[in-house]
Curated annotation (Swiss-Prot):
Catalyzed reactions: chlorophyllide a + oxidized 2[4Fe-4S]-[ferredoxin] + 2 ADP + 2 phosphate = protochlorophyllide a + reduced 2[4Fe-4S]-[ferredoxin] + 2 ATP + 2 H2O
Annotated [4Fe-4S] cluster binding sites: 36
Gene name tied to this protein: bchB
InterPro entries hit by this protein: ChlB/BchB/BchZ, LI-POR_suB-like_C, Nase/OxRdtase_comp1, P-CP_red_C, Protochl_reductB, Protochlorophyllide_Rdtase
GO biological process: light-independent bacteriochlorophyll biosynthetic process; photosynthesis, dark reaction
EC identifiers of the protein: 1.3.7.7
Family indicated by similarity: Belongs to the ChlB/BchB/BchZ family.
Assembly notes: Protochlorophyllide reductase is composed of three subunits; BchL, BchN and BchB. Forms a heterotetramer of two BchB and two BchN subunits.
Signal sequence bounds: none
GO molecular function, one term: 4 iron, 4 sulfur cluster binding
Protein name, entry field: Light-independent protochlorophyllide reductase subunit B
Organism: Rhodopseudomonas palustris (strain HaA2)
Active-site residues per Swiss-Prot or TrEMBL entry: 287 (proton donor)
Pathway membership: Porphyrin-containing compound metabolism; bacteriochlorophyll biosynthesis (light-independent)
Length: 541
């Protein structure tokens, strides 16, 4: 067990909640203590849904453990059915509720409801949120679509002449990163190709819709973490092929078009010729030359991280210096992707490891989750969010897909805006020594004040501590300690500061830190140009 202040994924029952919340006509009865009801806030506060998730908690408390908690669950299930009248019900236990071992599935089936009741048994202490979502969706598909499966050995009938091909879109859930807009984008893309969408699941579907998944000609797996297992089962039982390409980025979208048209038996050429993304031209234009070889670190779920690495390398000309994911189930795919960019894959759910890797690699842009946004802010590196988990600002009111050609436009804007443009960088270099625009100058609208010299700034904290100590009677060792710390900090000579400014801005901070460390270790009080180059030689060994 590991204590942490952040986790990339919640427990698996949160994944089950994401499936239930995205659907209509499905209710989830969760055997859980009072404290586990926090999960509602994920959907109402972060995703800003206008209604609570369709989840009933048994909310047992410590005083209930001496009584029959099984009866408490059965009462909650009866009340939920009577109140909500769902088309189907899933039942399970939270991570804490599973310790009681009350068998929610058996208890619910004993109640004899006239609707499908699906038990979701999730190993709370071995698996996490995305696995829980995938397992829940898989169990729903098996239970609801299974009765309509053809007999074993039966061949899939050919599509009638004149009937448009159809497919299912599998994988979008509640609390997913831009899932709502991705559905709209891919549905529109398929419509232009002449392909109908039979069912979108789980988001927006009902149990009755899940039951007719087998009517489609093939399946589009939008998010393999969620839909991969269910799509494999549908392929095995209903003989429905499914797509392997996730259409994030221009190149991937073109590959996706070729894949779905091959499955549907139609010509992809007209759509490929009419592709409307601005990303290729924008990234090739002269104004974008400053993007070339920008060092980028990427971390997120496997689907978005792998797609982001391809876009960064092939479409924007970035140099991928780090690639990682918290999706351990997709470790093989991530390692294969990392080989293409000659980087060491980082597969971890410990945000401290991610922060250490970012600090080590010194990227110029970080692409990640909400946590990488915090990490990049602490390290002073530009950042863009590409993957869940995300906070409220990444559920925008506007249309902002990640998939398809419009998604590529959104990605270009999102990734490029945090960066310093090439012209801006050149102007800063040209005017860095100007009396008005140099780093030490005060903003012009604040008057004619001047920044304090470096030596004065270093000495000031010690003087302030000494003054306060005399006034308050703090012991002399504290004063001596503060003075010693101030004295230990090396002072930069003006010519050394000027030389430091010649170092590119994205490694200037590292050069400053290394030089100050070298000076402190060698007892150098004033950093000169010679000290700067001695430090460079020392750390280059």
């Amino acid at each position: 067990m590991q204590l942490t202040v952040w986790t990339y994924e919640g427990p698996p029952h949160v994944g089950a909640m994401r499936i239930a919340t995205g659907m209509e006509g499905l209710h989830y009865v969760l055997h859980a203590p009072q404290g586990d009801t926090y999960a509602d806030l994920l959907f109402t506060m972060i995703e800003r849904r206008n209604k609570r998730p369709p989840v009933t908690y048994t909310t047992f408390a410590a005083r209930d453990l001496g009584r029959d908690t099984a009866e408490l669950f059965m009462t909650a299930a009866r009340d939920a059915y009577a109140r909500f009248q769902p088309q189907a019900m899933i039942v399970g236990a939270s991570c804490t509720g599973s310790l009681i071992q009350d068998d929610p599935g058996g208890l619910a089936k004993s109640l004899g409801f006239p609707i499908p009741v699906i038990a979701i048994d999730l190993p709370a202490y071995q698996r996490k949120e995305n696995w829980g979502a995938a397992e829940t969706f898989y169990q729903l598909v098996r239970a609801l679509a299974g009765p309509n499966a053809p007999a074993p050995g039966t061949k899939r009938p050919e599509r009638a002449a004149g009937v448009r091909p159809s497919c299912n879109l599998l994988g979008p859930t509640a609390l997913g990163f831009r899932h709502r807009d991705d559905i709209t984008e891919i549905t529109g893309l398929l419509g232009k190709l002449g392909i109908d969408v039979n069912v979108v699941a789980p988001m927006g579907s009902t149990p009755a819709d899940i039951a007719r998944l087998g009517d489609a000609d093939f399946n589009v797996v939008m998010y393999p973490e969620i839909a991969g297992q269910a799509a494999s089962w549908l392929h095995r039982i209903f003989h429905q092929p499914f797509t392997k390409t996730v259409p994030i980025g221009v190149s991937a979208t073109r590959d996706f078009i070729q894949e779905v048209t091959a499955l549907a038996g139609i010509d992809p050429a007209p759509m490929l010729q009419a592709s409307s993304s601005r990303l290729p031209w924008y990234s090739h234009s002269v104004d974008s030359t400053y993007l070339t070889n920008k060092r980028v670190f990427i971390f997120g779920d496997a689907t978005h991280a792998i797609a982001a690495a391809r876009i960064a390398s092939e479409e924007l000309g970035f140099k991928v210096v780090g690639l990682g994911s918290y999706s351990r189930e997709f470790g093989r795919e991530l390692r294969e992707a990392a080989k293409r960019y000659d980087v060491e894959p980082l597969i971890t759910d410990d945000y401290l490891e991610v922060e250490a890797k970012v600090a080590e690699l010194h990227p110029e842009l970080v692409l990640g989750t909400q946590m990488e946004r915090h990490i990049a802010k602490r390290l002073g590196v530009p950042c863009a969010v590409i993957s869940a988990p995300v906070h409220v600002q990444d559920f925008p009111a506007r249309y902002a897909p990640q998939m398809g050609f419009e998604g590529a436009n959104v990605i270009f804007d999102t990734w490029v805006h945090p960066l310093m443009m090439g012209l801006e960088e050149h102007l800063l270099t040209m005017f860095k020594d100007d009396f008005e625009f140099k780093d030490g100058a005060m903003p012009s609208h604040l008057g004619t004040g001047h920044a304090a010299p470096v030596a004065e700034a270093v000495a000031a904290p010690a003087a302030a501590v000494a003054t306060e100590s005399v006034a308050t009677g703090v012991a002399a060792p504290d004063i001596a300690s503060a003075t010693a710390v101030a004295a230990a900090a090396a002072v930069w000579a003006p010519e050394a500061e000027k030389e430091l400014q010649k170092i590119p801005f994205f490694v200037r901070g590292k050069a400053r830190r290394n030089t100050e460390r070298f000076a402190n270790e060698n007892g150098v009080a004033t950093i000169t140009v010679e000290t700067l180059y001695d430090a460079k030689a020392h750390f280059a060994r």
